[in-house]
Amino acid sequence: MKKADILVLDFGSQYTQLIARRLREQGVYAEILPFNVSLTDIKAKEPKGIILSGGPASVYATDAYFCDKGIFDLNLPILGICYGMQLMAHHYKATVAPAGHKEYGKANIEIKKDNALFKNLPKKQTVWMSHSDKVENLPQGFEVLATSENSPFCVFGNEDKKFFALQFHPEVQHSEFGKNILKNFAKYACNCESVWNMGSFAKTQAEKIREEVGNDKVLCAVSGGVDSSVVAALLASAIKEQVIVVFVDNGLLRSREKEQVEFMFKNTLGIDLISIDASEIFLSRLANVTDPEQKRKIIGNTFIEVFEEEAKKHKDVKYLAQGTLYTDIIESSVVGASKTIKSHHNVGGLPEKMNLKLIEPLKEIFKDEVRALGLELGLSKEVVYRHPFPGPGLAIRIMGEVNRPGLELLRKADVILLEELKSTGWYDKTWQAFCVLLNVKSVGVMGDNRTYDNAVCIRVVDASDGMTATFSHLPYEVLENISRRIINEVEGINRVVYDISSKPPATIEWE
């Protein structure tokens, strides 16, 4: 079992993943586990500290979430955040009740006592609150470390036990010195060293791959995107002669995607590539299917079938490698009290029975860490910083049924969007950009004639790891040119809209 410097127990906060990210940014390896993980599993990870995340529940409610009380007897530093703070207070017999004044947004705190969390930080700072309950009295054995206007117990702790509790969220960017607070907890309370980086990760994963695979062969599924390209490069660095790299044209690719992928692997990466055209089988199975989850399941199942057929042509193939990321795992499974958001075709979409063992060397890292790993492995910036493209491809960018006419419309619109972003310098400034073909038509006028054609939505977002995102504030003239070109150059589209939703509450992809 992989060891972790700090374990984050997930009680359902939308920010839980950010806690792990902020710690990893400091070179400390943090891992997220469900709140009800067993004490045995916690001990097996040999953590140096534990963080209790926030969450939507109330500790006094009948359906409250509680972790194993034994964690408080492990002689490990513990940091409680929001719900985690209230849980710690509740455990030590303090009263937690509904707050008369709910707090959502920025607040000012004042540090009242020097302590490990606020070492070398200003006495007054701005933090981000998001809670509807409050701690009414100080738990026995604890002391106040900081206060806010609405909370005399905003931060409390027991420095002998190295237990600390925060009412606010240090993991979000709106908390002025949040990263420093988490870093101080890891460094001064937990005695963690900043040794986690992609160089050490690459070395560890290569050794793990060699040990697990032995003399068998690995079928590596690639899409041409960053994730699968990095997986292929990592496998090649570990067991190059045992890797069979396969690219499947599922009929759901962007314009000229197949040709670009083949060129990149053969000429840029120097990796032999087997290219399979399976577009007919994918599109036939997607016919008349409109439910997004069903689309993902069908695509996931069909991918595996195609790969298994290819594996039969090669001796000693026992493994299938995929570019599954930590974000995929989080969004596809119930981690702690968190809810399933959507199935990813390479996680929840997989059949329960496979004839190939799955190997996912990136499943413990986030997107920005994948990019850093790619550079560490020698991939070019052009490959590493390519915009993400989902495994299900354009199928989840067409609302409703997927068919060839719709795919062709979407491809043409997408080409124009990317051309305009690249020519204006906005492509490299954004995380992801694509078009969505909506399953609605609208009335328009072109020349002197009435039209009743399709509407396309432009989605361009800024992000660092894909867990959260904001819509990109593109200049009006850029948006205007994109809209004008799509309507004038793509027959069958007469309306273009811009998605100004952030994640959360929306996801980046529409399906």
Curated annotation (Swiss-Prot):
NCBIfam families: guaA_Cterm, guaA_Nterm, PRK00074.1. ATP binds at S223, G224, G225, V226, D227, S228, S229. Homodimer. Gene3D superfamilies: 3.30.300.10, 3.40.50.880, HUPs (3.40.50.620). The active site is at C82 (nucleophile), H169, E171. It is an enzyme of class 6 (ligase). PANTHER family: GMP SYNTHASE [GLUTAMINE-HYDROLYZING] (PTHR11922:SF2), GMP SYNTHASE-RELATED (PTHR11922). The keyword ATP-binding applies. This is GMP synthase [glutamine-hydrolyzing]. Catalyzes the synthesis of GMP from XMP. GO terms for cellular component: cytosol. Residues 5-195 form the Glutamine amidotransferase type-1 domain. Pathway: Purine metabolism; GMP biosynthesis; GMP from XMP (L-Gln route): step 1/1. It catalyses: XMP + L-glutamine + ATP + H2O = GMP + L-glutamate + AMP + diphosphate + 2 H(+). One of its GO terms (molecular function) is GMP synthase activity. Keywords: ATP-binding, Glutamine amidotransferase, GMP biosynthesis, Ligase, Nucleotide-binding, Purine biosynthesis. The keyword ATP-binding applies. Residues 196-386 form the GMPS ATP-PPase domain.
